[in-house]
Swiss-Prot record:
Matches recorded under InterPro entries: AICAR_Tfase_dup_dom_sf, Cytidine_deaminase-like, MGS-like_dom, MGS-like_dom_sf, PurH-like
HAMAP family in the cross-refs: PurH
One Pfam match: AICARFT_IMPCHas
Domain commentary: The IMP cyclohydrolase activity resides in the N-terminal region.
One of the GO BP terms on file: 'de novo' IMP biosynthetic process
One GO location term (cellular component): cytosol
Keywords attached to this entry: Hydrolase, Multifunctional enzyme, Purine biosynthesis, Transferase
Protein name: Bifunctional purine biosynthesis protein PurH
Pathway named in the protein's UniProt entry: Purine metabolism; IMP biosynthesis via de novo pathway; 5-formamido-1-(5-phospho-D-ribosyl)imidazole-4-carboxamide from 5-amino-1-(5-phospho-D-ribosyl)imidazole-4-carboxamide (10-formyl THF route): step 1/1; Purine metabolism; IMP biosynthesis via de novo pathway; IMP from 5-formamido-1-(5-phospho-D-ribosyl)imidazole-4-carboxamide: step 1/1
Amino acid sequence: MINRALISVYNKEGLLELAQFLKNKGVELISTGGTYKYLEQNDIQVTEVSKITGFDEILDGRVKTLHPVIHSGILAKRDNKEHMDTIAKKDILPIDMVVVNLYPFFDKVDDNITFEEKVEFIDIGGPTMIRAAAKNFKDVIVVTDVGDYSKLIEEIDSKGDVPYDFRKKLAGKVFNLMSAYDGAISNFLLEEDYPEYLSLSYKKMDNLRYGENPHQSAAYYTATAGTAPMKDFTQLNGKQLSYNNIKDMDIAWKVVNEFEEICCVAVKHNTPCGVALGKDLYEAYVKTYECDPTSIFGGIIAVNRKLDVKTAEEISKIFVEIVIAPDFDEEALKVLMEKKNLRIIKCSVKPTNSMEIAKVDGGILVQSADDKLVENMEVVTDKKPSKEEINNLIFGMKVCKYVKSNAIVVVKDFMAKGIGGGQVNRIWPTCHALDRAGDGVVLASDAFFPFNDVVCEAAKYGIKAIIQPGGSVRDKDSIEECNKNGISMVFTGVRHFKH
């Protein structure tokens, strides 16, 4: 039996309908501050919490419900005679329902406000009440999610009360919410990349149809705080995004944003299969397509400029899963939308280079992003690369960062003509990339050459310049082979393994 409900919410969505429903069922409503005023202004009879506690709100509203009368009314076990006798002697009435949503710390932590102002959005009274109610869920219904109001109304209307399973689920949602809420506050105050206890605060954005494969279930969660591209994008067209789509989008968007120049990238199975720069998007796309006309089929296209109609028409000639761009011309959008299943993604948020997390069985690995590229290039051969070759080398190394190790990228005219990766030795991806390219000017490697075989193979294909981190005990062998074949080579001192 629900006789008394305490309501204290920041988000007033759906509140009037719920409050009126409870009132019609004969439930006494107790409320605080802004919620009390809101209900009263909308002609819903409500008792202010200070009338129950005999204690006015103080400290600018910081202390409203932190009172034994409130928490005894919530925590008293109805089937415990001693509990009920105690609160009866103290003239404390049981509270049967707690409806609370918290100060929006998740949102405010990223606002352009002072540190002190952000601290004021750390809720204290709300979490205390809902944790108490959740602990005593058999006797007290606790509601923290506006999305549960309709289900709550339905249950009470049809059954006169809320069944155990739903009460338990609502209680579980409290601790689920508090885990994320406290985690966000902890991260805000600590400002540490590697704290003693790692709190990850994410909220479910969508249930996905399946995971990497149809027999795997999956969901998509986004960070509760901060702005990031794979959180703050807009889908303008097409089917629901899949697990694999989102992973591929992430890589594609990171690659294309490595470049200030006009760039296009094609991604397939979480690996770039074509990357190119151009004087305009049309040229960049055509060059990207020519990198690998076979693998681009069914892939993802990303560009770093507003997509124009000419490029959209060219993209529409083949089947791709997704097109992602910072914006779209109106005519370009019309062309792409003719394919009703094509997922069109608008994203204007740059990659964050945030901490990277990998799950292992029983733990997680955390590392900083691989955001270092070339600090000091050292020419180690007799021949020096030309300025054009240096720029192509840097282009190739930027692409290498996103290819699974061992990674080799062959470049000509700012076009990744050959991409080889994911092999357990370095010569196999070298042969694959050179064979794919047919001809190229420069070659980039994500790690050093353990032997001179990569240089020997590159020489057969007329490679003019090579970029690699260096650091092998046999660097001398590779340098000698370059000198023998008139190839210039530079060391960066920066490795880019990707597992």
